[in-house]
Amino acid sequence: MSDMRLIVAGAGGRMGRALIRAITESAGATIVGALEAPTSKWLGEDAGTLAGLPANGVKLSADLWALSADADGILDFTVPAATLANVAIAAQRGLVHVIGTTGLSASDDAVIKSVTNQAVVVKSGNMSLGVNLLAALVKQVAKSLDDNFDIEIVEMHHKAKVDAPSGTALLLGEAAAWGRGIDLNAHSARGRDGVTGARRAGDIGFASLRGGTVTGDHTVIFAGPYERIELTHKAEDRMIFANGALKAALWARGRAPGLYSMADVLGLGNAST
């Protein structure tokens, strides 16, 4: 099979540059497009040079329709508004759409789901193998422990991250909720401050820390009577997300239309969300 021809959305950002490197260093894929916002200062720049690699002749552009004429897929780690705009074009063009954008609302998710009867979409709050295995463990632990074990999720990211809790924290929260057989939206505790009263039984708590250059640390705490279990993942380089996204795109090529997750890509069944 020929190399999969991929577009990187948000090519000028940290994740975009990591994705360019991952594709360039891979076997089985090639970069044919680099997408940026119409106001980006990187428009017209060479994608390879921008990623710290030799020039590859792919110039950053704001025109996804033109870029997608000869593409097979798009890797999208941008912002919700950009992802929603990309979804429509990717579906029309028949592109595999790998979405790692975080901060998406329920209505955003509904828009994405609406195209999956005609398009292949792989969407996850985290594309790394380690986090998705962690989610599988969280499901099993939450299912196995009695409900007198309180669940708290602590995450830390670099100071430039704009959404909280992180997409990964929410993924882990969904995994814990699945294990408990509850709806996360109805049992989510965020932003505790002041006199909050006693902890509500059954809640899944979230705490978000921001500072420095932290790529991503996540800990799921199961706090029970006189004992505590902590499951932790620490991301040391964005390349783990980029390589995971590339793996997802290659896996999704030729699949039937639908909405897939990294659990599907990694063969974990329903072990993560």
UniProtKB/Swiss-Prot annotation:
This is 4-hydroxy-tetrahydrodipicolinate reductase. It is found in: Cytoplasm. Catalyzes the conversion of 4-hydroxy-tetrahydrodipicolinate (HTPA) to tetrahydrodipicolinate. The lineage of its organism: Bacteria, Pseudomonadati, Pseudomonadota, Alphaproteobacteria, Hyphomicrobiales. Belongs to the DapB family. NAD(+) binds at residues 10-15, 36, 100-102, 124-127. It catalyses: (S)-2,3,4,5-tetrahydrodipicolinate + NAD(+) + H2O = (2S,4S)-4-hydroxy-2,3,4,5-tetrahydrodipicolinate + NADH + H(+); (S)-2,3,4,5-tetrahydrodipicolinate + NADP(+) + H2O = (2S,4S)-4-hydroxy-2,3,4,5-tetrahydrodipicolinate + NADPH + H(+). The keyword Disulfide bond does not apply. It comes from Rhodopseudomonas palustris (strain BisA53). Keywords: Amino-acid biosynthesis, Cytoplasm, Diaminopimelate biosynthesis, Lysine biosynthesis, NAD, NADP, Oxidoreductase. Its main location: cytoplasm. The gene is dapB.
